[in-house]
A protein has these predicted regions:
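Active-site neighborhoods and metal-handling regions in enzymes and metal-associated proteins
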Residues: 1-368
């Protein structure tokens, strides 16, 4: 099912990287990387990719047939008790004579630290290495199939944002706004959407929608809509102004939009992300918002809403170079205005030869 040859080619590219680094095999337990190599998001994933030869997938006994059909991987080994899963993986490593084994060190659903620690205890003869950078070396640059899915996810973001704007009214709770967006997106085919809502004067970044925080007249409402299609995400943020707009809020919005354009213009192949960040910091300081800005203007988008490069929480990623085929969300970091709320406008872009092409489409100036 899906695109078996596409996923086999990804496995082969990864195997070449493993061989170059002297790694005998890699165990994939992160949901997004399992999907990258198999085309399937399957809970409790376990995939063993040797540097040479066919991959092995480990599945719950009664799921094995469907896993084989959906992934196209013929070597499916089963378990019924959790201990049998570890025994099966350890046995495959011993049988393969693997001495150096990679793990995807990532904080993600189903990437269990307990499994990792138990693996090291059971397989003391094995040297364990982090293969997350190798996987993301592949995942950061999208192919045409991935970009097409992200384009379709972008259209869903627009539908979700329209539902959010319609729902924003004085007295409505953040949770009620989010509920309308979730309903719209899931009815449209988004399986795992994410929605964040911050109604001023509350100041929260990446705000989980709260039932007791309500939209108030005269304050901004910032809405983040992340929709997925075919497993791939697009990410969009807009700020809705409710009632009369204060001069301070309007000025902050105008400055943020200037920064949004500056970042968009800076996302060209060959650009170092930190250099764009410096330009943004200079602008915010010149305009009087140096103490209101948050460092980290962009992040990757793909099988995760936020994936490498993540310039907010992983400082080394700020040294990464923009490449053609990357998909990035910008301007990610908001302006936080105590007593007013949060100002943020964010879009998803694909990097082409001549610069960033915006994929998410929705108007910027939103007033209710």
């Amino acid at each position: 099912m899906g695109q078996p040859e596409l996923h086999r080619s990804r496995v082969r590219r990864f195997q070449r990287l493993l061989e170059e680094k002297g790694i005998d095999a890699a165990i994939i337990r992160t949901l997004s990387s399992f999907a990258y190599f198999t085309g399937v998001k399957w809970l409790r994933p376990a995939l063993l990719i040797p540097s040479e030869g066919d991959p092995i997938v480990f599945a719950f006994e009664d799921e094995a047939q469907e896993v084989e059909e959906r992934t196209g991987i013929r070597d499916v080994r089963t378990w019924r008790r959790v201990g049998e899963l570890m025994a099966g993986i350890s046995g495959a490593i011993r049988d393969g004579g693997f001495k150096v084994v990679g793990f995807d060190y990532s904080l993600e659903r189903d990437a269990y630290v307990l499994f990792f620690e138990l693996f090291k205890k059971v397989n003391r003869q094995v040297e364990v290495r982090d293969v997350h950078p190798l996987i993301m070396e592949l995942r950061m640059v999208k192919d045409e199939h991935e970009i097409e899915l992200i384009k379709r996810a972008s259209k869903l973001c627009s539908r979700g944002m329209e539902a959010a704007v319609d729902a924003v009214e004085p007295g409505v709770s953040e949770l009620e706004v989010a509920a309308e967006v979730y309903h719209t997106l899931m009815k449209a085919g988004s399986r795992h959407p994410l929605v964040y809502v911050d109604a001023g004067p509350s100041v929260r970044i990446h705000a989980e929608p709260l039932p007791d925080v309500r939209v108030r007249r005269g304050y901004p409402v910032t809405v983040v809509v992340a929709a997925d299609y075919g497993g791939y995400y697009a990410d969009m943020t807009r700020t809705v102004f409710v009632g009369l707009l204060s001069e301070d809020a309007k000025k902050a919005f105008d400055v943020f939009m200037e920064a949004h354009s500056l970042a968009e213009d800076g996302l060209k192949p060959g650009t170092i992300l930190a250099n764009v960040q410096k330009d943004l910091e200079r602008l915010f300081h010149e305009k009087g918002y140096g103490s209101n800005m948050v460092i980290g203007f962009a992040h990757g988008v793909g099988l995760l809403v936020e994936e490498d490069p993540i310039t907010t929480i992983v400082p080394p990623h700020r040294r990464y170079q923009v490449k053609k085929g990357m998909v990035l969300a910008s301007l990610h970091a908001p302006l936080t205005l105590p007593g007013t709320g949060v100002i943020k406008v964010e879009d998803t872009y694909v990097i082409e030869e001549d610069g960033a092409k915006r994929l998410t489409e929705y108007e910027y100036e939103l007033k209710k």
